[in-house]
């Protein structure tokens, strides 16, 4: 497939051909989208889902909450659409609001009708959704990659367009290199971006195996970095490191619950020794009471 140049598609959105001005233009995107175009109440049945929607996680629970909000407060931010030559309107931004409005039983929804061609719609949809705070890291990474490929942009140019640092853009784009199983853990928020960045040091089955351990044992980012480092230096000892980190996490949790210092040590015969340290005598009675309860 031939890559599209930056050209008219992005200019239609940013109203400029100068990359030096794109950051300022995108920073005021919300205002410009409100000011430009035609506001109208459209029949909900005349709207069609956009083909550039980066969001995958349209969970029933989230839609139900949004539908309840729309029932009580209405739609505050208009849905951005464009007219289709075949009739009806295509959603550029606001598909969740549209689906929730249908669920809430609305017949019409407020819309901002934009006059944009295909490439302009691609840029507008991707950038509007990338700038949303509730996209998960994997959705944002995939949307950034599509924006980059669609307009043949460098990491720096993508950063200028969306108003983020080049380092942030590069780190997000690297998430697309993760194994599919690890991506799913990130999409379902079983892993955070910090975990994923550490896991990028591993490959293939090893990456998946360690990611599953991290998610199951709810390791911190720091613990994940330690585990990955050990895997790279001595793969045969990775299991022991994982168990040590799990014991460390358990010790910390017990210390918080008992309000006392708790240490857990594995003995050579496979057993474990738990030590509870108290700095004041009267805390012993409190500890006994907690253990009895």
UniProtKB/Swiss-Prot annotation:
Keywords: Chromosome partition, DNA-binding. SUPFAM superfamilies: KorB DNA-binding domain-like, ParB/Sulfiredoxin. InterPro entries: Chromosome_partition/occlusion, HTH_ParB/Spo0J, ParB/RepB/Spo0J, ParB/Sulfiredoxin_dom, ParB/Sulfiredoxin_sf, ParB_dimer_C. GO terms for molecular function: DNA binding. GO terms for biological process: chromosome segregation; positive regulation of sporulation resulting in formation of a cellular spore. Coiled coil: none annotated. Pfam families: HTH_ParB (PF17762), ParB_dimer (PF23552), ParBc (PF02195). Transmembrane segments: none annotated. The keyword DNA-binding applies. The keyword DNA-binding applies. GO terms for cellular component: chromosome. NCBIfam families: parB_part (TIGR00180). Belongs to the ParB family. Involved in chromosome partition. Localize to both poles of the predivisional cell following completion of DNA replication. Binds to the DNA origin of replication. This is Probable chromosome-partitioning protein ParB.
